[in-house]
């Protein structure tokens, strides 16, 4: 995980972006704790955004090629109107783990709040080239969805063998 972008969503709890998780640095502390637990030295960069549009515009402005590159895989978890399962999307990349780094492929995940995306947010994600993917019909907490999706990607690419 290179970057984490926390953003407000249309259906998300409005007070979330003003919570202690965000305002007092608790989110960054969680990233540090996760880095220690993983026995890693890499701490993902943390960015805060008021809404999804601002988030995507910020990423586009900072690293235009990230959202434009066809070799990058962009997906948004959505159990309402998925186009594919996350497993099926990732399974298209049947290359060795060492080749992933050399190829420059990035997986860009958009994980919404427990209440999901609005139709307007789905349209915005589609306009930016995101594929709506499911991990089943059940609603997962955001942090659980993030962990599970990362695990599916890593396992599918052979990083957990």
Where are these regions (language model features)?
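A mid-sequence, solvent-exposed acidic-amphipathic segment
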Residues: 50-100, 105-107, 111
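Short glycine-/acidic-enriched loop or helix-start segments at secondary-structure transitions
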Residues: 16, 86-87, 119-122
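Structured adenosyl-cofactor binding patch, chiefly the S-adenosyl-L-methionine
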Residues: 119-161
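RNA substrate-binding interface of SAM-dependent RNA methyltransferases
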Residues: 1-75
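A C-terminal functional module that forms or caps the active site or interfaces directly
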Residues: 104-124
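Short, glycine/charged-enriched secondary-structure capping and boundary segments
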Residues: 19-22, 89-92, 123-125, 148
């Amino acid at each position: 995980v290179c970057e984490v972008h926390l953003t407000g969503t249309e259906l998300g709890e409005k007070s979330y972006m003003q919570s202690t998780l965000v305002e007092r640095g608790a989110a960054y502390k969680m990233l540090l704790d996760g880095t220690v637990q993983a026995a890693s030295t890499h701490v993902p960069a943390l960015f805060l955004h008021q809404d999804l549009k601002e988030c995507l515009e910020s990423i586009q402005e900072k690293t235009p090629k990230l959202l434009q590159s066809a070799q990058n895989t962009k997906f948004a978890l959505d159990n309402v109107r998925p186009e594919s399962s996350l497993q099926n999307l990732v399974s298209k990349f049947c290359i060795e783990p060492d080749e992933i780094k050399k190829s420059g492929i990035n997986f860009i995940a958009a994980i919404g709040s427990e209440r999901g995306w609005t139709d307007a947010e789905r349209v915005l994600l589609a306009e930016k080239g995101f594929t709506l993917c499911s991990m089943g019909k059940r609603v997962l907490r955001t942090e659980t969805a993030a962990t599970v999706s990362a695990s599916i990607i890593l396992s599918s690419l052979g990083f957990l063998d």
